[in-house]
């Protein structure tokens, strides 16, 4: 059985027209049929079936079903599940097992979600195509010669291919939203601090945020509401109360909605069909009573440069812990301590991770700190001011999720700067920490998905998802 929304599935489960065990077995069978696509790194066959049987027993005995009762979910392999592997798609963590659950995982499990396995990703969440993985590339479910996006490409492909009803990813600069756009699904990055990062392997700590990938806005918001909230294990998690997202979404009306459309998002380098599809969808909302407001965000050209200075600096610090001494991969060429450190990291990390560590170390060095890192922090503050000012005048900022549709596997691997541009529209929301979502709005002439990207003010996830629901391609 494969249903398009969790509410449909829940209705079938609660009425006992179908069992959790049957649902889970169906998903596991499909996962097995797609095993050559590298979508999952680890599949929890026994654990998922055992959990499903417990849920069936709970229901038969009159127990109260949780809010996610029987929802089959996938978890990106940089999020901790106790006793399961935690590879981050890297050789350096190939044999490591988590010793605790991430807070997000604990909260989902407490509401009766069923975890099917851990999904493939770009190594340490560094990439936009899911090609930077020690476990191989993941194909796009719509065209297996093309990428699913990254770094949460495995999670996006799992949902799009019907191998999970929803999935968790992590989003540092677009790693949930960009693959969602490439895979014709919804990808939500909440406000920084809305979801605890406890149990998420750090890439860039002031940017990282756990996000949700789902087939529709209702499912994504439901999962968000369960994970959101203060966590004593994460000092950066917000104390703000978690609202009723369903009620907030229902309150959103198209008539009178002010949609900010930055002129910088629709430049000559934007793929023609992507621009046409996004504009057409915006015009549909205008015809229903929304107001399209032209806005300008002149600093947009500096987003990618500032972002890659800041995140590589944080990555060079965060990844220093992987040295072969405490856990993970240790080189056999370890004649002394220094050789162990150098060879373990050289052999354990992939090309893109090493590139970013070196770049981060460079921008933090004494001679270049003020020139690069300090200046990028100043640019970040300017971005925060500009986006706050813009969102005082409009309800939401809208544009394409990516400047181009899914590209061919291998097409951009030798040109990192071109690869980085895949995130040019998603990076600003990460720089400022505001909530953002990619919602599917159409298909181009080659039947490749096109997503629209929306940004709202801090902690306005309900409003954001309500607007997205009006845009979502049926």
UniProtKB/Swiss-Prot annotation:
Gene Ontology molecular functions: ATP binding; glutaminyl-tRNA synthase (glutamine-hydrolyzing) activity
A Pfam family recorded for this sequence: Amidase
Enzyme active site: 76, 151, 175
PROSITE patterns: AMIDASES
Biological processes annotated in GO: translation
GO cellular component terms, semicolon-separated: glutamyl-tRNA(Gln) amidotransferase complex
Keyword Protein biosynthesis: yes
EC number: 6.3.5.7
Keyword Translocase listed: no
This protein's UniProt keywords: ATP-binding, Ligase, Nucleotide-binding, Protein biosynthesis
Transmembrane annotation, as ranges: none
Reaction(s) the record says it catalyses: L-glutamyl-tRNA(Gln) + L-glutamine + ATP + H2O = L-glutaminyl-tRNA(Gln) + L-glutamate + ADP + phosphate + H(+)
Domain of life: Bacteria
Function recorded in the entry: Allows the formation of correctly charged Gln-tRNA(Gln) through the transamidation of misacylated Glu-tRNA(Gln) in organisms which lack glutaminyl-tRNA synthetase. The reaction takes place in the presence of glutamine and ATP through an activated gamma-phospho-Glu-tRNA(Gln).
Matching HAMAP family: GatA (MF_00120)
Family of the protein in this entry: Belongs to the amidase family. GatA subfamily.
Subunit structure: Heterotrimer of A, B and C subunits.
Protein name from the UniProt record: Glutamyl-tRNA(Gln) amidotransferase subunit A
Annotated source species: Chlorobium limicola (strain DSM 245 / NBRC 103803 / 6330)
Taxonomic lineage: Bacteria, Pseudomonadati, Chlorobiota, Chlorobiia, Chlorobiales
């Amino acid at each position: 059985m494969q249903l398009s929304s969790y509410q449909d599935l829940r209705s079938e489960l609660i009425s006992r027209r179908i069992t959790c065990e049957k649902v889970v077995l169906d998903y596991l069978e499909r996962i097995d049929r797609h095993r050559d696509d590298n979508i999952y790194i680890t599949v929890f066959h026994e654990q998922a079936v055992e959990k499903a049987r417990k849920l069936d027993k709970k229901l038969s005995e009159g127990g109260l079903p949780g809010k996610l009762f029987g929802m089959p979910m996938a978890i990106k392999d940089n999020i901790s599940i106790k006793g399961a592997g935690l590879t981050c798609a890297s050789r350096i963590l190939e044999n490591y097992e988590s010793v605790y659950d991430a807070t997000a995982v604990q909260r989902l499990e407490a509401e009766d979600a069923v975890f099917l396995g851990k999904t493939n990703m770009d190594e340490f969440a560094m990439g936009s195509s899911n090609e930077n993985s020690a476990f191989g590339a993941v194909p796009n479910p719509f065209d297996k010669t093309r990428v699913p996006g990254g770094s949460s490409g495995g999670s996006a492909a799992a949902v799009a291919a019907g191998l999970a009803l929803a999935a968790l990813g992590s989003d540092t600069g677009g790693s949930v939203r960009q693959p969602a756009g490439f895979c014709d699904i919804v990808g939500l990055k909440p406000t920084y601090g809305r979801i605890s990062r406890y149990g998420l392997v750090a890439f860039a700590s002031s940017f990282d945020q756990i996000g949700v990938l789902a087939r529709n806005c209702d499912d994504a918001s439901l999962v968000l509401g369960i994970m959101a909230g203060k966590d004593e294990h994460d000092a950066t998690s917000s104390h703000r109360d978690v609202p009723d997202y369903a009620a907030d979404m229902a309150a959103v009306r198209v008539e009178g909605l002010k949609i900010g459309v930055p002129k910088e998002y629709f430049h000559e380098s934007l793929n023609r069909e992507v621009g046409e599809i996004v504009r057409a969808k915006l015009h549909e909302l205008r015809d229903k009573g929304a107001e399209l407001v032209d806005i300008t965000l002149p600093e947009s050209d500096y987003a990618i440069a500032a972002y890659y200075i800041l995140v590589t600096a944080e990555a060079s610090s965060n990844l220093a812990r992987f040295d072969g001494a405490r856990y993970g991969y240790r080189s056999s060429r370890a004649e002394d301590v220094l050789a162990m450190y150098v060879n373990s990291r050289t052999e354990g990390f992939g090309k893109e991770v090493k590139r970013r560590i070196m770049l981060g170390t460079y921008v933090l060095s004494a001679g270049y700190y003020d020139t690069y890192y300090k200046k990028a922090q100043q640019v970040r503050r300017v971005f925060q001011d500009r986006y706050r000012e813009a969102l005082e005048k409009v309800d939401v900022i809208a544009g394409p999720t990516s400047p181009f549709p899914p590209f061919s596997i291998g097409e951009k691997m030798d040109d990192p700067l071109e690869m980085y541009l895949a995130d040019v529209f998603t990076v600003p929301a990460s720089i400022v920490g505001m909530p953002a979502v990619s919602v599917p709005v159409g298909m181009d002439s080659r039947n490749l998905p096109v997503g629209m990207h929306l940004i709202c003010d801090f902690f306005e996830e309900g409003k954001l998802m309500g607007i997205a629901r009006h845009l979502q391609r049926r």
